[in-house]
UniProtKB/Swiss-Prot annotation:
Transcription factor. Interacts specifically with the W box (5'-(T)TGAC[CT]-3'), a frequently occurring elicitor-responsive cis-acting element. Residues 326-392 bind DNA. This is Protein WRKY1. Belongs to the WRKY group II-d family. It is found in: Nucleus. It comes from Zea mays.
């Protein structure tokens, strides 16, 4: 057990040394060979520690039923072979005249440092504390002249460039998990785009087909028109796909581009159209060809496309003395009436009777009779609708 603790301690200390070299706060020059040696030592220490832990019968470390728990190896997004490269393998794969690339360049943990043909592998590498915005490149003249002086190479700041890998280096293939994640992101973006287009088309239809949805403006017959959509106060969140509809405010008006509404933040424009062409597919409401009779209903037997709103009917009420205490006794007038129903009144012991004109078949005139609450000897007669015929001598009711 003491050997296990000692191996663990040495592995952690070697890892701390590598981290200390990488996170140099003073920005000093760190030789690449020293960094490679420290990294290899740390990997070797942890490898020996793993071997000791996995050996259940070695040196009596594990006794009885105690076992080391092994966690299943998760799928890695990056290729694990990049982290196992060593200087010997890289030197064997590269040509003799080409300097061996540093493992840091293979790991791609930091920006790539371009090395020219004249530079040596012993040249120190500056490890930044954070990712720099620019890449450090050695001055080209220092490598071309082939000077053998021991002075450090001159470093200049240049714009970031993309350094291509060597010609013989195979491109690492992405694992299936990473490809599946990219496909999911692309499908989700397409779904969001389709939802936004669907919402915009629905709002366009509602604004065009509504009674008060759109108003036409502009004098020119061939002027271009636009639908103004205001995105000023929209604060979309990713909580649901319908948040875009709740936060989007639409102005249901069609305005000319040369008018006062051209300063809107977002506009959907249509092409040049004539005055006879409907604006943006504006469909006029179809009206039935049949004429309306006095009842307010269409005379056609087919499906009616008229508005179903109830017309405002003018009512007039008069007070007349009651003939008797019977509910059916109502005063006669110049028209004949037929009772078709009655309804109790809240707060009154007497019901309200409903009558329709029976002088001519199909007359839309109606009236209802009820007793006055304050004076039961008086009747309140309310007329509704107009007669569509001349006066006929009424029979006594």
């Amino acid at each position: 057990m003491e050997g296990m603790e000692e191996a663990n301690r040495t592995a952690v200390e070697s890892c701390h040394r590598v981290l200390a070299l990488l996170s140099n706060p003073h920005g000093q020059l760190v030789p690449s060979k020293e960094l490679v040696a420290a990294t290899g030592e740390a990997v070797a220490k942890f490898g020996s520690l793993t071997a000791k832990l996995s050996n259940s019968n070695g040196d009596g470390l594990l006794q009885g039923h105690a076992r080391v728990r092994k966690v299943k190896k998760p799928l890695h997004i990056f290729d694990s072979n990049l982290f196992l490269e060593s200087s010997a393998v890289a030197a064997a794969a590269a040509p003799a005249k080409t300097p061996s690339p540093s493992p840091i360049l293979g790991l791609q943990l930091f920006p790539r440092y371009h090395q020219f043909e004249g530079s040596s592998s012993k040249d120190p590498v500056r490890i930044p504390t954070q990712f720099p915005k620019r890449l450090l490149l050695e001055k080209p003249t220092a490598g071309m002249e082939g000077s053998t002086s021991q002075s450090p190479p001159i470093v200049q700041m240049v714009q970031p460039v993309s350094v291509a890998p060597p010609a013989g280096t195979p491109t690492p293939a992405l694992p299936p998990a990473h490809l599946h994640f990219i496909q999911q992101q692309q499908s989700y973006q397409r779904f969001q785009l389709m939802q936004q287009m669907k919402i915009q088309s629905e709002m366009m239809k509602r604004s065009n087909l509504g009674d008060q949805g759109g108003s036409l403006s502009g004098g020119g017959g061939g002027g271009r028109k636009g639908v103004n959509l205001k995105f000023d106060s929209s604060n979309c969140t990713a909580s649901s796909s319908r948040s875009f509809l709740s936060s989007l405010s639409m102005e249901g008006s069609l305005a000319s581009l040369d008018g006062s509404r051209t300063s809107r933040p977002f506009q959907l424009l249509s092409g040049s159209q004539t005055a006879s062409t409907p604006e943006l597919g504006l469909v006029q409401r179809r009206r039935c060809a049949g004429r309306e009779d006095g009842t307010g209903r269409c005379a056609t037997g087919s499906r009616c496309h008229c508005s179903k709103k109830r017309k405002l009917r003018i009512r007039r009420s008069i007070k007349v003395p009651a003939i008797s205490n019977k509910v059916a006794d109502i005063p006669a007038d110049e028209f004949s009436w037929r009772k078709y129903g009655q309804k109790p009144i809240k707060g009154s012991p007497h019901p309200r009777g409903y009558y329709k004109c029976s002088s001519v078949r199909g007359c839309p005139a109606r009236k209802h009779v009820e007793r006055c609450v304050d004076d039961p000897s008086m009747l309140i007669v309310t007329y509704e609708g107009d007669h569509n015929h001349n006066r006929v001598l009424a029979q006594p009711a």
